[in-house]
């Protein structure tokens, strides 16, 4: 851009929309934040509309890609030289920190989207120097282009780092699609500063399992725990509690946790040979000439042995570029004492260590340094339960390698979803329970057979309410965050779902009994999962017909029925619907307003704001509220798929009044009570954005559009977990 000579006025108004403007949220902080639902909008995605990542990934010569990554590991670059000439440790840390932000509570975080490229993760204190790891990989990403997502590359790079250092990994699956902007739905904590004291997210400082839900890290900006100890105070037994709780929140048991801790620290090193004040701003705060990188180090050479990342300095093992059992050898054969790193961080170092057991310097093999352990590493020795596991691993290296390889695969694939989404030749054949396996079906249904089944379902003793609500309950716990839940598998009939309060166990038991009886009379095998969805679909179709619209609600057979043996009860507990605005359900009163809870569920279901609106209006008209509650059922034609909810919501002849724990809809002139409503019902008339959608569906010329849009959104919910379609 060429400057003209002489001064001139700024070409934009100061305080423009591209700088520090006051947002609507600033002026009205309690307004409903619908932005999280816009993440499902594809406008920010620069790829062609018909781009299919799965098809592109299949074009990759996977063996060539893996060899490229192996060659890359030892191709040290002068601008960011590899420790001991091998990038393995750096790539493993990058992959780990990509996948390790996953939490079981809501399925968010994790390595499934390449989110490490964007704020806040790209600038977290725990991710110092990972900007360099990503830039080092750019030539490989550039070569493979659209066929290889950043998200898949991060994980595969970690895999190949281990392979290149001697570990046989359990496998690899592609299929992670990149996002193109920061995620707005993920709650990382309420703190306003990095590494704020843990008291900010624990209800009790002593009870280390009181970490705020859904968080799975002890401090803002960390992946798991503070490596120096709780709040930077070394105490391995106390740190063990943090390790156990944070890994539990990622669905890891003690054995997996110990294996991951040891295996992750068998290779690579920590970097703290300098002063923290020598580091420049993080990527998001760095100047434009840094080109998206940050933490420029002004100390010494700023790279190599002078690298600064965590502040802890040293390698864990004697041979940090080789997979072996050296971690346990050093941990158990030496006593360890607390020391300070050159950067002033707490670390554990061995007492009277043999010279040959020390790792060599990253630049000069004639120099040796003490190995180190973090407080979390010492927890593996000092916590009695972890110690038993660690001793077993020490005595049986092959067992350790197998447990670690499986745990690493779980860590890096947990949020990829079921195996139907896995891509590539290295997908393990073995089904693992955390993948929520579902048996494949061996039947198909013709259109006539589907029509006959619909008729049989409608002729059972089940009401439309029972059919629709059960189908909805079966499908609604799908999460687009980690692709778990949904109607496929019919797990609504198994523990724990069959007993969830929100699934109305008594009603559910009746519905399942009737459907199982019908299933036993059919001429051909049809899964219960298909019958549950088809029952709701048939009832919706009938409700549309009763409203005067002959529409066919799409139905795709092919769902299987999972078994108890294929279901990890404990890991399904977080999927329990404690709230569901679509059925006007709250298990109890929560500090968070019901409408905000609904937005969270809507996002996890992969729905947009218009889809949410049409579904709520339709479910109210169908009378599908929890327990057949009348809140929000603004119609005299309950069970008919009409737009009455929107017509009456926007009718200025009505007035809304607070009454105890609900609202009353009264005639503006006579004060006659017409209906009752919840906060969720009223928000579709009070929020300006949602009201615009409500007005659209209330229009006289949009009654048919309402029916068609409801059917489309209903079908999307029913098929959300059908990755085979």
UniProtKB/Swiss-Prot annotation:
Q: How is the cofactor bound?
A: Binds 1 heme b (iron(II)-protoporphyrin IX) group per dimer.
PTM comment, free text = Formation of the three residue Trp-Tyr-Met cross-link is important for the catalase, but not the peroxidase activity of the enzyme.
Catalysis: reaction(s): H2O2 + AH2 = A + 2 H2O; 2 H2O2 = O2 + 2 H2O
| MF term (GO), any | catalase activity
Per UniProt, heme b binds at 265
The alphabetized list of GO BP terms reads: cellular response to hydrogen peroxide; hydrogen peroxide catabolic process
Q: Give the enzyme's EC designation.
A: 1.11.1.21
- Enzyme group, top EC level? oxidoreductase
Q: Which GO terms describe its cellular component?
A: cytosol
Cross-link for Tryptophyl-tyrosyl-methioninium (Tyr-Met) (with W-96), residue positions:
224-250
The entry's keywords: Heme, Hydrogen peroxide, Iron, Metal-binding, Oxidoreductase, Peroxidase
What InterPro entries does the record tag this protein with? Catalase_peroxidase, Haem_peroxidase, Haem_peroxidase_sf, Peroxidases_AS
Q: Note the site residues: Transition state stabilizer.
A: 93
From the record heading this protein, give the residue positions of the covalent cross-link Tryptophyl-tyrosyl-methioninium (Trp-Tyr) (with M-250).
Answer: 96-224
SUPFAM superfamilies in the cross-refs: Heme-dependent peroxidases
Q: Which domain of life is it from?
A: Bacteria
Cofactor(s) of this protein: heme b
Which PROSITE patterns is this protein grouped with? PEROXIDASE_2 (PS00436), PEROXIDASE_4 (PS50873)
Keyword Endoplasmic reticulum (UniProt): no
Function, in words: Bifunctional enzyme with both catalase and broad-spectrum peroxidase activity.
Subunit details for this protein?
Answer: Homodimer or homotetramer.
Family matches, as NCBIfam families? cat_per_HPI (TIGR00198), PRK15061.1 (NF011635)
Listed PANTHER family: CATALASE-PEROXIDASE, HYDROPEROXIDASE I, BIFUNCTIONAL CATALASE-PEROXIDASE
Q: Which family does it belong to?
A: Belongs to the peroxidase family. Peroxidase/catalase subfamily.
Protein name (Swiss-Prot/TrEMBL): Catalase-peroxidase 1
């Amino acid at each position: 851009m060429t400057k003209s000579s002489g001064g001139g006025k700024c070409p934009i108004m100061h305080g423009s929309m591209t700088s520090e403007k006051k947002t609507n949220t600033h002026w009205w902080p309690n307004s409903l934040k619908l932005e999280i639902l816009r993440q499902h909008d594809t406008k920010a995605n620069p790829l062609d509309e018909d781009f299919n990542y799965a098809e592109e990934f299949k074009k990759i010569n996977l063996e060539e890609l893996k060899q490229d990554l192996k060659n890359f590991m030892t191709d040290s670059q002068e601008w960011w030289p590899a420790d001991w000439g091998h990038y393995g440790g750096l790539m493993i840390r990058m992959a780990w920190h990509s996948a390790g932000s996953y939490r079981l509570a809501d399925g968010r975080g994790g390595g499934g989207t390449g989110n490490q490229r964007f704020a806040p993760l790209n600038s977290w204190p725990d991710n110092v120097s990972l900007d360099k790891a990503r830039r080092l990989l750019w030539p490989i990403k550039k070569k493979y282009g659209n066929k290889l997502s950043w998200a898949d590359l991060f994980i595969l790079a970690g895999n190949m780092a281990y392979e290149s250092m001697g570990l046989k990994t359990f496998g690899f699956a592609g299929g992670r699609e990149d996002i193109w902007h920061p995620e707005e739905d993920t709650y990382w904590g309420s703190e306003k500063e990095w590494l704020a004291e843990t008291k900010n997210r624990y209800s009790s400082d002593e009870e280390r399992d009181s970490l705020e839900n859904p968080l799975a890290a002890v401090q803002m900006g960390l992946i798991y725990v503070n490596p120096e100890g709780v709040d930077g105070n070394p105490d391995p037994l106390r740190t063990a509690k943090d390790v156990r709780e944070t890994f539990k929140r990622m669905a890891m048991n003690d054995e997996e946790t110990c294996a991951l801790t040891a295996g992750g620290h068998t290779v690579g090193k920590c970097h703290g040979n300098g002063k923290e004040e020598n580091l420049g701003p993080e990527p998001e705060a760095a100047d434009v000439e840094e080109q998206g990188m940050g933490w420029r180090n002004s100390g010494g050479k700023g790279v190599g042995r002078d690298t600064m990342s965590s502040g802890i300095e040293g390698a864990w093992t004697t041979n940090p570029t080789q997979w072996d059992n050296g971690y346990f050898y050093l941990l158990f054969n030496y006593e360890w004492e607390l020391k300070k790193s050159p950067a002033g961080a707490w670390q554990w170092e061995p007492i009277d260590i043999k010279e040959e057991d020390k790792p060599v310097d990253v630049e000069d093999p004639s120099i040796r340094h003490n190995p180190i352990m973090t407080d979390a590493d010492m927890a593996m020795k000092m916590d009695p339960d972890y110690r038993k596991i660690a001793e077993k691993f020490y005595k049986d290296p092959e067992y350790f390698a197998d447990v670690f390889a499986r745990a690493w695969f779980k860590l890096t694939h947990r949020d990829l979803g079921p195996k139907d989404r896995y891509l590539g030749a290295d997908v393990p054949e073995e089904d693992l329970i955390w993948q929520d396996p579902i048996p494949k079906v061996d039947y198909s249904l013709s259109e006539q057979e589907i029509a006959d089944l619909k008729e049989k379902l409608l002729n059972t003793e089940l009401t439309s309410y029972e059919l629709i609500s059960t189908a909805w309950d079966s499908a609604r716990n799908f999460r687009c965050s980690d692709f778990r839940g949904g109607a496929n598998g019919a797990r609504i009939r198994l523990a724990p779902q069959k007993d969830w309060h929100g699934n109305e166990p008594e009603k559910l038991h009746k519905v399942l009994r009737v459907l199982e009886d019908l299933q036993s009379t059919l001429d051909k095998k049809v899964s219960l999962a298909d019958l549950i969805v088809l029952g709701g679909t048939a009832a919706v179709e009938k409700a549309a017909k009763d409203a005067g619209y002959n529409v066919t609600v799409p139905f795709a057979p092919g769902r299987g029925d999972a078994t108890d043996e294929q279901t990890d009860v404990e890991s399904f507990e977080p999927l329990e619907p404690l709230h569901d605005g679509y059925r006007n359900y709250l298990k109890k009163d929560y500090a968070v307003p019901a409408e905000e809870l609904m937005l969270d569920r809507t996002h996890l279901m992969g729905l947009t704001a218009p889809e949410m609106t049409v579904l709520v209006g339709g479910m109210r008209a169908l009378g599908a509220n929890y327990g057949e509650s009348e809140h929000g059922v603004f119609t005299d034609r309950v069970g008919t798929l009409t737009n009455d909810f929107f017509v009456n919501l926007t009718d200025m002849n009505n007035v809304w009044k607070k009454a105890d724990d609900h609202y009353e809809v009264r005639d503006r002139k006579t004060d006659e009570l017409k209906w009752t409503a919840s906060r969720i019902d009223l928000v579709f008339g009070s929020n300006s954005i949602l009201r615009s959608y409500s007005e659209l569906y209330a229009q006289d010329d949009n009654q048919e559009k309402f029916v068609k849009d409801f059917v489309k959104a209903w079908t999307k919910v029913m098929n959300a977990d059908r990755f085979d379609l």
